[in-house]
Swiss-Prot record:
One of its GO terms (biological process) is negative regulation of protein kinase activity. Changing E644A: Strongly reduced interaction with STIL. Strongly reduced interaction with STIL. Does not affect interaction wit PLKA. Residues 1-26, 94-119, 443-474, 541-570 are annotated as: Disordered. It comes from Homo sapiens (Human). The gene is CEP85. Residues 443-455, 463-474 have a biased composition (Basic and acidic residues). This is Centrosomal protein of 85 kDa. Keywords: Chromosome partition, Coiled coil, Cytoplasm, Cytoskeleton, Nucleus, Phosphoprotein. Residues 434-476 are annotated as: Required for centrosome localization and for its function in the suppression of centrosome disjunction. The modification Phosphoserine is found at S17, S126, S141, S623. Residues 14-26, 98-111 have a biased composition (Polar residues). The keyword Protein biosynthesis does not apply.
């Protein structure tokens, strides 16, 4: 916008264009600027460069001494040369932020057909005026003001890149490397200049800056240097429109005169032709990127505002919760407070970093202004003013943030104090609850101790009763054995019959003995006679033996002849064969006997297994029978007690008169007695059903076995006086007696069956 104001002293004819009305409206509605006149050395340099470009010289044959002399002569002035006396410092009512600005506001020139599609005549006139060195036409030419905002490189006819400024000495190059202006947000003064694009691509100059890569990391903390999301590789820190041609807006690129120049570069117009469609595309892309920057800044402010607002940690009223829940709520609140404190510290650090960066930028701007020659004073002054406005904007933003942080800190301190009070109250309530809980625990422990004592007493009683039952059981077993050993009537009759039979047999044997004695005498006489005969026979045998000896002698004489040994060998062979056959037969018989013995052993083992199983079964039956006996005894004892209690209850009922109301003590005792009788009756019924089920071979009911009963409401005192209640209880007792009789018969039948099976197995 500074280039679009009119100079009051110079009356230069300007070129009219469709967008000039818009620029005049924006300048009249906005703030009034007094733009300084460009100094003569800078203007002569601009005209010199343009004349070189018009002549078509490639600057190859030209020496660098003339250019260096001009530059040195222009830089011979003091380092910070003030502007002319008749030019005032531009002043304006600067807005604190450009976030709310849009292309439709008066300070910004809208992009439309009037600004995007410029006539070729206006472009040609502006180009001619620039080449002739008349810089006064710049304030009326919309395309030329845009051209001054961009420095783009173009390739000449001979393929050598051109530069606007000549080469300088080594000291200037080193000083140029020390300072790079960061990319800043576009302000009100830059918005109109950035939206007014110069449409002639022949006058775009490529400005080579080798330090742009190093300056990217210097101002990363500033919100203007952040990369917009979704812009891709097009939006960089050096500006929203950095492409291959190097076109950068003035507010978003380093200063033009501070980069390292190349000695072989001269300014020369580009041979490319002008295309309206390309200009419209550039306008649209630039407009979109500016909108992206604005939206990004708005989002950052909204995020900073949202950070300062935090809801209350506790509600107005606290619900009644358990101590564990209160502790968890307190822990979460403490965690939130710690997070908020960390966030506040981070914001403070960020603000301090921003302040440091602003101070560094101010120092760099002042050092750059003091170290630059006079021809760059105008551009640097404009840049300094823009940076000062940015500085005021950042200071205002810093003040807002500090105020918001202080308010938030006060709110957080209030919430912290309230939460501490609530924590104190919760702790007190927790202490009271813990005391009550400890008292209840002590009471429960005392109750448990009393119950343990009662249980121990009951266990001792149960042990005594079990010992008594064992003694009784042993006595019963001894009596049963004694009764089993006693003979019965049948045994006595059998023994008497056997005695009579044995007496008859003894008489018969006596008679036989007499007969045998007589026979013995007769046989003795016969034996005597036979002995006499034997003696005679012995004598004859002696005679025969003598005769045999004589015969043997004769036979020995005959054997000498040779026929006797063969006959004897044949006889011995026959005897050997017969004996061998006998041995084989005996061996076969032995094998048969062995197989029979093995089969018999197997049968014996099987019989032993079956006998063992029968013994185990008999033992199990004996144990079951023993249990049944003990259960029957217990039932009989309990039945007897129940009958006695029933009789006493009947006596009490008879003694009680129906007309006169009973005393409260007797009524209470009667009620307790009735309750005890009802519980005993229920227990007896349960035991009876369990024993019956076991006797029948079924599994018992676990609820009855464990003594689990359903909750029953006790009978009131009025129920005892009703005859229906008494009749119902009597019916239950009679039914219990019948169950006991059935159980007794079942157990006796089972016992008889077991005894019969044991007798059969024995």
């Amino acid at each position: 916008m500074a280039m679009q104001e009119k100079y009051p002293t110079e009356g230069i004819s300007h070129v009219t264009s469709p967008s000039s009305d818009v620029i005049q409206k924006g300048s009249s509605l906005g703030t009034e600027w007094q733009t300084p006149v460009i100094s003569e050395p800078f203007r002569s340099r601009f005209s010199r460069c343009s004349s070189v470009a018009d002549s078509g010289d490639t600057a190859i044959g030209t020496s660098c001494s003339d250019i260096a002399e001009d530059f040195c002569s222009s830089s011979g002035s003091p380092p910070f040369q003030p502007i002319k006396s008749h030019v005032t410092i531009p002043t304006a009512h600067v807005m604190p932020s450009t976030l709310g600005t849009s292309p439709a506001k008066p300070n910004s020139t809208p992009v439309g057909p009037s600004s995007s599609k410029l006539p070729l005549s206006g472009l040609a006139e502006s180009v001619g005026m620039t080449r002739n060195g008349d810089l006064g036409a710049m304030k009326h030419s919309p395309g030329l003001s845009r051209d001054l905002m961009y420095f783009s490189g173009a390739t000449g006819e001979n393929g050598i890149e051109q530069s606007w400024f000549p080469a300088v000495g080594h000291e200037r190059q080193e000083e140029a490397r020390k300072f790079d202006i960061p990319s800043m947000e576009s302000t009100l003064n830059q918005s109109a200049m950035m939206e007014t694009l110069y449409s002639d691509p022949h006058h775009r100059v490529r400005f080579h800056n080798p330090r742009t890569s190093t300056s990217k990391e210097l101002y990363r903390v500033l919100p203007e240097a952040k990369k917009a999301p979704g812009s891709g590789a097009v939006f960089e820190r050096n500006g929203p429109h950095s492409n291959s041609s190097g076109v950068l807006p003035l507010g978003l690129q380093p200063a033009p005169g501070l980069s390292k120049p190349l000695p072989s570069q001269v300014w020369q117009p580009s041979p490319d032709t002008w295309h309206p469609r390309e200009q419209s595309c550039e306008l649209s892309t630039c407009r979109q990127q500016l909108e992206l920057i604005r939206l990004q800044m708005e989002q950052m402010q909204l995020q900073n505002g949202a950070i300062c607002h935090h809801p209350a940690a506790f509600g107005p009223s606290l619900p009644i919760l358990e101590p564990a829940q209160w502790i968890s709520i307190l822990n979460s609140n403490e965690h939130l407070l710690k997070e908020k404190e960390l966030l506040i510290d981070k914001q403070r650090k960020h603000i301090s970093q921003l302040e440091q960066k602003v101070r560094e930028s101010e120092l760099q701007v002042h050092s750059a202004l003091l170290g630059r020659p006079a021809p760059f004073g105008d551009v640097c002054l404009l840049r300094l003013q823009e940076l000062q406005r940015e500085n005021t904007f950042l200071r205002a933003q810093f003040a807002q943030k500090t105020e918001a942080l202080s308010r938030e800190k006060i709110d957080l301190e209030k919430k912290l104090s309230a939460s501490e009070v609530e924590v104190q109250l919760i702790r007190e309530s927790l202490k009271v609850a813990l005391q009550k809980h400890s008292e209840e625990v002590k009471k429960q422990e005392e109750r448990v101790k009393g119950r343990d004592k009662h249980i121990n007493n009951l266990k001792k009683k149960c042990q005594k009763e079990s010992e008594q039952n064992r003694e009784k059981q042993q006595r019963i077993e001894t009596l049963e054995r004694y009764l089993a050993d006693l003979p019965t009537l049948e045994d006595h009759q059998k023994q008497s019959q056997q005695l009579k039979d044995s007496e008859l047999k003894s008489t018969e044997l006596q008679e036989k003995v007499t007969e045998l004695e007589s026979l013995l005498e007769e046989t003795q006489a016969i034996c005597r006679e036979k002995e006499i005969q034997l003696e005679s026979l012995r004598q004859r045998e002696a005679e025969f033996s003598s005769a045999g000896h004589s015969l043997q002698d004769k036979q020995s004489v005959e054997e000498t002849s040779g026929e006797g040994p063969e006959v004897e060998m044949e006889s011995w062979q026959k005897r050997y064969d017969s004996l061998q056959k006998i041995v084989e037969k005996q061996q076969q018989k032995m094998d048969q006997l062995r197989s029979q013995v093995q089969s018999l052993e197997q049968e014996v083992a099987q019989e032993e297994g079956t006998s063992q199983a029968l013994r185990e079964e008999a033992q199990r039956r004996d144990s079951a029978l023993q249990q049944l006996r003990t259960a029957v005894k217990e039932l009989s004892v309990q039945n007897q007690d129940l009958i006695e209690k029933n009789l006493t209850l009947q006596e009490h009922l008879r003694q009680a008169q129906p007309g006169s109301p009973p005393s409260p003590d007797t009524a209470q005792l009667a009620l307790e007695l009735h309750q005890e009788l009802a519980s005993c009756l229920q227990d007896l019924q349960a035991v009876c059903s369990i024993v019956t089920q076991r006797a029948q071979g079924h599994d018992p009911n676990l609820s009855l076995l464990l003594g689990i009963h359903s909750a029953q409401h006790p009978e009131t005192q009025l129920d005892l006086q009703k005859p229906d209640v008494i009749k119902r209880k009597l019916e239950e007792v009679q039914q219990l007696r019948r169950d006991i009789e059935d159980l007794r018969t079942t157990m006796s039948d089972r016992y008889a069956q077991d005894m019969g099976e044991n007798c059969v197995t024995q």
